[in-house]
Every structure is written in C-alpha cells, then in structure tokens.
Amino acid sequence: MTAIQKNTFSSLTPAQFQAIGAELDAIRNRMRADLGQRDADYIHTMVKRQRQFEVAGRVMMMIPPTWALGVASLSVSKILDNMEIGHNVMHGQYDWMGEAALNSKNFEWDSADTSKNWKITHNYEHHTYTNVLGRDHDIGYGLLRMSEDQKWEPRFLANLPLTVILHTFFQHFVAVQNLHIEEALIYKTKTAAQIKEEFKPMWAKMKKQLAKDYLLFPALAGPLAPMVFTGNLLANLARNVWACAVIFNGHFPEDVEQFPESVIENETRGQWYVRQLLGSANFSGGKLMHIMSGNLSFQIEHHLFPDIPAHRYAEIAPEVRAICEKHGLPYKTGSFAAQTLSTWKRIAKLSLPSGRSGKLSRRKADEEALAPLAMAA
C-alpha cells in the first residue's frame, strides 16, 4: 500500500489556506457561542479543588507522619494553579464570565513570573509568532539550541545539562525571560544597567514568592520549619519540572516544524492556523492527565483556539484531526513518553555541530513559496 503524502506549508494553495481558515473559524465561533454555565462550573470547581489541595498540603506538611502526602498535595495545588487555572485564565478563556477574580487583566498566579510579563512573552510573542525563528523566544529561551537553523555555538554542547537546569528552575527562568539576558551576557547588545532596571519589577514578585514559601510558612511551623521549607522546595520543583516537560512535549518533538521570519509577512488567517498546526504537538492520556497538564496535552487545539476554555479541547480535537486529514496535513500526537523521548533526542542532536535534518529543506521551500502565495491570497 502506498503511503499517503502529507502536505507541508509550501504545498498548500491559497484556496486551501482559505478553506482551512474558514473551517477552523467555524469551530471557534460555535464554541464561543456555546460558552455558558458548564464552563463556569468547571473553572469554579478547579479553583475550589486547587485551594483544598493547598490547605491540605500545607497542614499535612506540619505533621511528620503525613509530610510526604502534604508535599504531594501542595505539588498538585501548584500545578493546578499554574496549568489548568492560571495559564488558561490569563489567556482570557473566562473573561466572558465577568468575574474579577477570573479575569485575565486581574489574575495573579502562584509563580515567580508576573502575570503581566507572562502575557507579553507567552500570550503575545509566543502565540503570535509560534515557532518562528528569531521572533518566538520560546525556541530555546535564549539558552538552548532548539532549531537546525540556529547557528551552532560551543555553548550549545551544554544543551542537555542546561535543559535539566531549565526544568528545575523553570518558574524563575520564565520570570526573567523577557530580559533576554543572553543579549547582555553573550551578544553584548544590551548593557548590565538595562538588565538591572528591567529586572526590578520581576524581582519584586520573586521576593514575594520566596518569602511566602521559604520564610512565612516555615516560620508558622515553628520547630518543624526545616520540614516545611523542604516540602515547599520539593513542591515547587515538582511543579517546575512538570510544567516545563508539558511545554517542551508540545513544541519540540522531532516532527514539529519551525519557520523563517518571512512566513509571517502578509500572513493570512488560514496561514496562521496552518502554522499553529504544524508548529505544535499533542500527547495522549486520560482525564487526569489532561487536567494536570492544563489540557496542554491538546497543544494543537490550544494554539488554534487559545481563548476557548481548555477543557473543551477534548471535544474539539476530533474535528481538528478530521480537518487535517481532509487537507493532507499531519496531526502530530503520541504518548507522553514518546513525545518526551523525541524531544530529548532533538535536544541532544542539536547540541552538536552536526548536519541539518530534512526539515531545513522544507523550511527553505516554505520561504521560497511564500511570496507568490501571499500575492495570490
């Protein structure tokens, strides 16, 4: 049996881009029109559960026999706060409810990163310029080589250990991501004085988080302060590693595409949708996996519809997959383990100044095809 040839960005016609855009817009419009009580009930339940896990965790960590359960409970609380609640609320998924506490303009999460900073680096830069090399800073976070088209430098030999460090301290790396520290330390296009000034509001939030977890709650524990300090440290570590792993598995498996800057010149709605499809990947799992990942297990659907409540992605996914099959586009998904393995293989490969993969030729083809596509559109 002959294998079906999948389309790439450059092989689609303007009419196909337009059709894909219309079909995905129809899904989005239908979902927006259907938002209502079940969505409000869902997010209220998530907030309630997150608070219950936090209270239970902080109490149990002060009781030696239940300390380990307390660490686990607080870890779940922090993951829910960041993934299923904070990330999604800050995308404006629940702004329509008119509740100040769940409005993207007001929400502040349990993270060293300020919500204001996150909405710049993530909501705007990453979601607008998804996987566009030179515009999406999430491609390596200024730290790693995550694209075949990034010029290799000796520092990238440390890709693997630096990725471990990034996972370990993820909340602090994203907190300072907007500083683009590599521009001062490596490329000398920013000064230390600029970095220091821009760091002030970030440090204010980081201090609050550090004081809460490592001073306030340990102090409340009295003689058990070391146990609470350690428990908070482990809960933050669990949240950091899990959040980073989820994000990496949605963006860096080997079959996920990256694009030259020319792709976004005169980009149509349909072309934007296709770029999101080709630049994202899902991983499979049950309901608990979806909740704990903030439904970023449906990273493709999230990039297509970032302002649709994430718990809806499971029902949207079959329609998106059908559209991909209809137009010959790959729908990239796999188990969490498979996506993790693929991601780390890519990280390892790109640490070396080795030959480039076949993806480069496709990206070059994209670049060459863009001008006539844009004119025809």
Language-model regions: role of each:
Residues 27-37, 182-192, 258:
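Non-transmembrane, extramembrane segments of multi-pass ion/lipid transporters
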Residues 76-197, 264-354:
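Membrane-embedded catalytic scaffold of the fatty acid hydroxylase/desaturase
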Residues 218-219, 227-268, 353, 362-372:
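Extended hydrophobic/aromatic segments used for targeting, binding, or gating
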Residues 41-82, 156-172, 197-245:
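Alpha-helical bilayer-embedded segments of polytopic membrane proteins, i.e.
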Residues 1-56:
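Low-complexity, highly charged intrinsically disordered N-terminal segments
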Residues 1-8, 362-377:
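Short, intrinsically disordered terminal tails adjacent to the first/last structured region
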Residues 213-217, 227-247, 271, 275, ...:
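Feature representing long, continuous alpha-helical segments
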